[in-house]
């Protein structure tokens, strides 16, 4: 297993949970945070079963859950840990079926669910899980991670800005030039959105993100960072304060599964 980079503020809690793993744990990991890596740390030294969305469907189907439940009916001599990656991609019927496994605990079975957006999950599932919310890594951790790559200073600075606190994304941008170029465009668009007062131009820049929630969230994160940088450089004024409040509200809506198009359009209004 590759190195799992976690925030220092999460390390102690992960250690505590590891010493006494609950029946069901929900690991909430924002985009670019290594929720699956944390799950693997917690499941270490136990028989581990992995469940994730089918590539062709991008969801965890009810048939997958039924197969899991059938497997759980077999007697386990050793402790077994069921890791469900992208648990928020379970369909509603899948989650209802999964409730049976949560409601009928087996003393030798633990569940670790990893999710980016827990609000997509049923309250009845979430309420039966202990929650671990991962935090972004520090700038010092990010810089140390990038030292492993032979990048020029300009590229390193761009990656640190684009993927701040998200170690998996930092690795991806450092290792994949095409993905890096794609994300540099995010920064360009964010800068143009802040710079222009023309609604048509702003809307045109936003439109390319209507079909990609994760990129839309990253776009708003970058805009927020740019506004805060301007405030540090020139001081906060009513205009920047209004932009910050609006963008933060849009980012929150996107993370709560609001319609991407409608949420981003609020940046123009």
What are these regions (language model features)?
Residues 26, 81-83, 112:
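Structural motif
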Residues 34, 56-57, 90:
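Glycine-/small-residue-rich active-site loops that bind phosphorylated ligands and cofactors
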Residues 86-90, 118:
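Conserved Walker B
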Residues 46-63, 121:
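AAA+/P-loop NTPase substrate/partner-engagement loops
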Residues 12-17, 61-81, 89, 93-100:
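Conserved alpha-helical scaffold flanking the Walker A/P-loop in AAA+ ATPase domains
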Residues 96-113:
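Conserved catalytic/switch belt of AAA+ P-loop NTPases
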Residues 1-48, 108, 116-269:
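Charged, glycine-rich active-site and insertion segments that engage polyanionic ligands
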Residues 83-84, 133:
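Short catalytic-loop micro-motif centered on adjacent basic/acidic residues
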């Amino acid at each position: 297993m590759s190195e799992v980079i976690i925030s220092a503020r999460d390390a102690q809690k992960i250690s505590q949970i590891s010493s006494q793993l609950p029946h069901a744990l929900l690991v909430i990991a924002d985009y670019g945070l290594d929720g699956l890596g944390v799950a693997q740390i917690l499941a270490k030294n136990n028989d581990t079963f992995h469940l994730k969305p089918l590539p062709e469907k991008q969801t965890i189907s009810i048939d997958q859950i039924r197969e899991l439940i059938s497997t759980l009916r077999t007697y386990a001599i050793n402790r077994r840990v069921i890791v469900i990656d992208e648990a928020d991609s379970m369909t509603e019927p899948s989650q209802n079926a999964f409730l049976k496994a949560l409601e009928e605990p087996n003393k030798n079975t633990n569940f670790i669910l990893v999710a980016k957006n827990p609000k997509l999950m049923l309250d009845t599932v979430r309420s039966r899980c202990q929650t671990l919310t991962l935090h972004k890594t520090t700038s010092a951790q990010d810089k140390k991670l990038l030292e492993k790559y032979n990048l020029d200073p300009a590229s390193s600075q761009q990656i640190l800005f684009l993927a701040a606190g998200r170690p998996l994304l930092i690795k991806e941008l450092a290792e994949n030039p095409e993905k890096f170029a794609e994300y540099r465009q995010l920064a360009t668009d964010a800068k143009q959105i802040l710079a222009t007062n023309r609604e048509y131009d702003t809307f045109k820049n936003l439109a390319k993100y209507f079909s990609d929630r994760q990129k839309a969230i990253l776009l708003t994160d970058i805009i927020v960072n740019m506004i805060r940088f301007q405030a540090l450089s020139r001081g906060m004024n009513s205009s920047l304060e209004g932009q910050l409040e609006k963008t933060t509200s849009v980012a929150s809506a996107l993370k709560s599964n609001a319609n991407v198009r409608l949420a981003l359009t609020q940046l123009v209004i």
